[in-house]
Amino acid sequence: MRSQAHTPGRRFLAQSAGLLVAFLTAHLAPAATTERHPAHSPEEALKLFQLEAGLRIELVAAEPLVINPVAFVFDGPRRLFVAEGRGYPDPVEGSGQTTAGRIALLEDRDGDGRFERRSEFAADLGYVNGLALWRGGIFVTAAPDILYLKDTDGDGVADKREIVLTGFDATKTAQLRVSHPTLGLDGKIYVTSGLNGGKVTSPAHTGRAAVTFSLKDGRFDPDTYAFENTSGRGQFGLTFDAFGRRFFCSNRHPVMQIMLEPAHLARNPHLSFSESVQEVSKVQAEAAVFPISRASITADFIPSLMAAPHAGTFTSASGVFIFGGTGLTPEHQGNVFICESAQNLVQRQVLRPEGAAFRSDPPAAGKEFLASTDVWFRPVFLGEGPDGALYLADMYRREIDHPRYVPLESRALLDFESGKDRGRIYRIVRATPTPSADDATYRDRRDDLTKTVRALESPDEWWRADAQRRLVERADRAAVPLVETIAAQATRAESRTRALWTLHGLHSLTTPTIAAALNDPHPGVREQALHFAGELIARGQGAQLLPAAIAATRDGDARVRFCAALALAGSRDETVVPALAALVVRDGEDRWTRAAVLSGIAGRMDAFLAALQREPAAKPAAIAAVMEHLGRVFGAGASLDSCRQFLNDRLSEKGERSSRVSAVLGLVEGFRGRSGAKTAAQTDTFAAVLGAEGRASATVRDFLRFVAERAGDSQALLGDRLSAVALLGHSNFDFAGAPLGQLLAARQPPDIQVQAVRALERLGDPRGGALLIKRDNWAGYTPRLREAVLATLTAKPALIIGLFDAIQAGIVTAPEISSVRRTQLLKHADATVRQRAETLFQSLEGGDRMQVYRTYRPLLSAPTDVARGREAFLKTCSACHTHRGVGGKVGPDITGIRNQPADAILLHILVPNYEVAPNYQTLSIVTQDGRSLSGWLAAESESSLTLRTAAGGEESIARSQLTSLVASGLSLMPDGLEQTMAKEDMANLVAFLKSEN
């Protein structure tokens, strides 16, 4: 089951055909919705806001001056460029491109705080959704293009219009496209992928190869248009804090932080770590919001379909923005603000350091920064003005959802048109604001070099960013000594940071300036210095900076230490290795610092291990985590002799055994996945590394006996047991079969059961498959465990025949095999497998899923039993989905699904491929050792990818091990769930999902 509230479209808004007939009989039309909740004038709408105490909200522009604003950017006091997403929600996916998009230039010429003049800067554009200033013009995202527009004659209309990049996917709906161009400290313009991608080229540089833009965000050079992928996968929202840390958002994920870029992970091709993003805020069902409007606004004209209003969760997080102005109070500076358009509010969260990353939470529960009772209020974008105030774009429309996500027969009931002629922009300031000193100081004087440099010292982030951009554009070397003074002496750390990056943009950042910044009293400035030092060190030009960078591994700030690891990872100097070892012992429990350190040890793993062993003992958990990852790196990339030595050393070590088990597990996992290891037939990885004689040694036998005992020890820590169970999967079935079979028992913790299944699959012995599919065992499996078993039995050819036999014998029913797995088996390379699959699945592969939906829909009007619905959820859905904290994490958390109409829920249970979000589409992978895996891509790097499987686990696969990778476009959720329960239980299931408790 999949709720649209949890996917990158919007929430699904279906209404049932029975109600459709009833409403048509009563002459209900879409206009009735609007009449029941009419639009308010701009003045009336202001009265409906609930704003945080001590602040006030002011209208600065409204229709007809501005229509459907989706993004804006100030190019100076009283001048505002606005991207107008006119025509939204047109076009329906696949129906072609709109040309209704426009860019408006608004001006406040009389200085009264409201814009009164509009120039049509550009018209006849596609769906525009982002703006960025550069050299007197603006970059505009309007998939499939990024354009550059400029007014060269001063009439307020762009007469220069150039496509600088093209090839971005424009086949999906408007909210799933490249967006949010944002100038970073480094002078590059960053964009979100919109959860789609493309093949990006520049018409101005036809000789360049196309850049595959997929599952990543990106950036480009504003002068050369060179485009590259970056980490992250944002939908509509991208922001930087004052120290250049990048954050983004996506519907159910309000705040995420980029921790590692592709270049960092590419330094060590043997590091099987593909994550790059930290969830900063709470997500999905835990990401609470507190609307004061009706949260179920999309269907609130059919009260019988909706449960009572309640405090909801983020379903449409967008426009994430870190505020750096003085127009609010000091406590608001550095806070992150997120729009939630579906529920008519803006949430504020406070950022706090947490290890190398950040976390964020609302300052208080139960009340939002800004909310409205007006269901037409649709905040989508936030920004800061030259006056230090927070500005907000409100699309102001009846429906924010896209009709693509509404069943065709129900679209006529919803009013997607009202609001196409409306839009508002607001300013939020302190209730008793003071005029911005910067506004008065710098207005109309930005062509003066000295004044522009002075703006770097502004307390407002807008002026600091404006000054940096103008100085870099101007490229006047006369500014260099002035900027160097600010870098050394400015009171604000934010100003010193901007000055450093301005010097970098002017190609005038010197080693002494970097060295001084490495000793700056503020950790944010030291981070910047380490970035610059790392660039020089990697080029072999940073010898003078190396001692200070090494000293930074002992810094009192965790993020500075993390940045030091990234900086030193590019050095080949032997003095770096002990520093990295000491750092990872101190911060080994922080996964980002651990990954940063291990990214830099390619080619010197033996030296790193020796340095690590010289370090004093630290927390066992930290050492275990480090040793497992180090073992993986050894196994994947070291010579066979080095791997053998590493393994023998760990087997013969004395003392604490948990880190030994972790290290050995990492080594054999890494070795088994390496290219050319030839372990497809040799399933005993210990024998593959040590040879037959070494495998038969007493040391190995004793160690494996201990591992088997630890795996079954109910008193041991769960993490230690899981490592031991996984390690059994690298021995052989004769030794490990019996203990693994015992771990399938219902009395064992679920994680242990699933790990035992994976270990049996790794052994690859048909006897393991037979053990998994024994009638008595199968009957006692929970849904999660069944999913794990089915994933195992379809992963290797040797096990598939046993599964077929079990289906034929009635132990397993055919509908329990998902559509993705059925397709995999029906297209298998082995003709025997294909033929048996065709025989077994023939009855399931035909038929019209929408007809099934139409057949079941009338059941929704019958009496239901919520308790039986809960039983149906636990039996059928909980293996993959979490609901109120119960269940798996294969698919989205569906706790918030109760806000949807009943037949919308039914539709996506019965027709799971009705709409599949890009990040939940199934990938099918075949590896060099013959494994077949299906799942969705959880993360990827240059050298590996991580697959979230239907069994609920994650599999990291080195790209070098891929034989094939195919995206099916299908959901992992199977067709035919109705065949697993009685008809009335389907209605009971829907009732449970919509219930209060």
Task: Locate the predicted segments by residue.
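Bacterial N-terminal signal peptides
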Residues: 15-27
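Beta-propeller domains with acidic blade repeats across secreted/periplasmic ectodomains
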Residues: 30-451, 470-472, 885-886, 959-960, ...
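C-terminal capping alpha-helices of c-type cytochrome domains
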Residues: 60, 80, 136-138, 144, ...
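Sequence context surrounding c-type heme c attachment/ligation sites in exported
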Residues: 402, 424-425, 838, 845-846, ...
